[in-house]
UniProtKB/Swiss-Prot annotation:
Coiled-coil spans in chain: none
Subunit: Heterotrimer of A, B and C subunits.
Keywords (A to Z) from UniProt: ATP-binding, Ligase, Nucleotide-binding, Protein biosynthesis
GO cellular component: glutamyl-tRNA(Gln) amidotransferase complex
Entry's EC annotation: 6.3.5.7
Function: Allows the formation of correctly charged Gln-tRNA(Gln) through the transamidation of misacylated Glu-tRNA(Gln) in organisms which lack glutaminyl-tRNA synthetase. The reaction takes place in the presence of glutamine and ATP through an activated gamma-phospho-Glu-tRNA(Gln).
InterPro entries per UniProt: Amidase (IPR000120), Amidase_CS (IPR020556), Amidase_dom (IPR023631), AS_sf (IPR036928), GatA (IPR004412)
Catalytic activity field: L-glutamyl-tRNA(Gln) + L-glutamine + ATP + H2O = L-glutaminyl-tRNA(Gln) + L-glutamate + ADP + phosphate + H(+)
GO molecular function: ATP binding; glutaminyl-tRNA synthase (glutamine-hydrolyzing) activity
Protein name: Glutamyl-tRNA(Gln) amidotransferase subunit A
Pfam family, one: Amidase
HAMAP family xref list: GatA
Catalytic residues (UniProt): 75, 150, 174
Amino acid sequence: MSAIRTLHQQLIAKERSAVEILTETFAHIEAVEPKVKAFLTLTKEQALAQAAQVDAKIAAGETIGLLEGIPIAIKDNLCTKGIQTTCASRILEGFVPTYESTVTQELQEAGAIMVGKTNLDEFAMGSSTENSGYQVTGNPWDVTRVPGGSSGGSAAAVAAGEAPIALGSDTGGSIRQPASLCGVVGLKPTYGLVSRFGLVAYASSLDQIGPFARTVEDTAILLEAIAGHDPKDSTSLDVDIPQYSQLLQPELPKDKPLKIGIIQETFGEGLDPEVAEAVQKAIAQLQELGAEVETISCPRFRYGLPAYYIIAPSEASANLARYDAVKYGTRNAAADNLVDMYTQTRAAGFGPEVKRRIMLGTYTLSAGYYDAYYLKAQKVRTLIKKDFDQAFAKVDVLICPTSPSTAFKAGEKTDDPLSMYLSDLMTIPVNLAGLPALSLPCGFDAQGLPIGMQLIGNVLREDLLLQVAHVYEQATAWHQKQPQL
C-alpha cells in the first residue's frame, strides 16, 4: 500500500493531523538516528510550522494535494534556501544557499514537508557513504554494514522508516545501488527529465535527481512532482510528463506481451551467487506474470566502468575548481598569499576520494593525455549507447542485478578504491547512455541483507519501468519486510 496515499487519506479523514504525523516522524528519527546516522541536518521547527499550515487548510475545508503534509528527506547536495547545504564536505561547512533548487521548490509548492538533509559521500563521490566528511551512515538491516552510496543517507532514511520518501542524485548508480543495498525502490530518470538547477554539480553530463520510496507507487507519485521542463537548466527536456501513478496497472499487457532482455554480460565473474539466484528467480516470476524473456548481449557494457572513471573525474575537476575560498569554501585564514590560500583551503577542505578524482580528472584532461584518455572514453560512451539502442530494437525492458553483492561491512573496501568502484559495475553504463533505470527489492541473502534487481528502459520510458516493477511488487512481498532497529 502506498504510504503517501495512506497518510493522505488519514489527513483528509481527520484521523491524524499533519502536526501529529510530523511529531511522530521526528520522534522515530530521534530514536533510530544514533544507530543509522542518515541525517546531517534536521529541520524540525520549520517542518512543524508547515504541518500546522496544512492542518489549518484542512480545518478550513480546503482541498489538499496528495503530497501536502507528507514528510520527505532531501540529499544534502540539493540547495535549500536558508538551510545549510554541505555536500557532506568540510569545505562547505556552514554554507547556507540563498536560493532553492528547482526540485525542492516544486516539492514545497506541492506541500511536501522536508524533515532534513541526508548524508552522502562527499560531493556524491563514492559507493558506501563512508566518504562523508561528517559521519558514516549505517545500513538499517545491519548498522555495521554500509547503505551504499552516494545517496546512502536518503536510502537508509526510507528503509529505517525515518521518512516515507526521499530524493537522491545518481551519477553512476548513486540512487539505484543504495536502494538495492537498503531494500527500497530507487529510480534514476532519463537524463534531462528532472531539472538539475540547484543540484551541486559532480559530473554534469551524468548527474540526475530521482526518488526513493518503499513502494513503486510512491516512487511514481514523487517522480510526477519533480519531473518537467525548467528553463533554468539548459539540459532540461521539454516533454509532456505522464501521470505515472495513474498509469500503473495490476497486470502486464495481454494484447502485446512485454519483452524483457537479460543482459548476458552482467551474469558472470564477480557476481555474488546469492544475488544471481535471486535475480534469476525474479526473472522467472516475471515470465509467469506474462513477460517474454530472452538473453541480450551488450558487448561494450563492461567498458562502462573505465570510461566512467575518466569522464566523471574530468568533469568533476572542472566543477570543483570553484571551491577556492573566494566564491565558495571555508577559507584558510593562515595563508600568506592567494595561491597558498587556494592550496591550503582545498587541502584541508576536501577528503581523500574527492582529491583522488580531481587529480585523476586533471590528468586525463591535460594536453598530452586528452586524446588518449578523455576522447577515447567519450567514443566508448557512444558505443555503449549504440549497444543499448540495438537491444531496445528487440526488447522493451532490460534486466540485470543492481549491485554485484549485498551490503558489505563498513571499512571493508575503504583502502581499495578499485574494489569500491566495482560496486557500480551494473549501474554506470545506464548513466553513460542517459537512460532511465529502476532498482527494486527481489530477495534477501542468507544473512538477511536485501538484494535488488535493476530494470533499464529506453529514453523517457519511466512509465514502462514503473509498470513492470509495480506488477512484480504486487506479486511478491519483499517490499513489506522491514529492518528491526
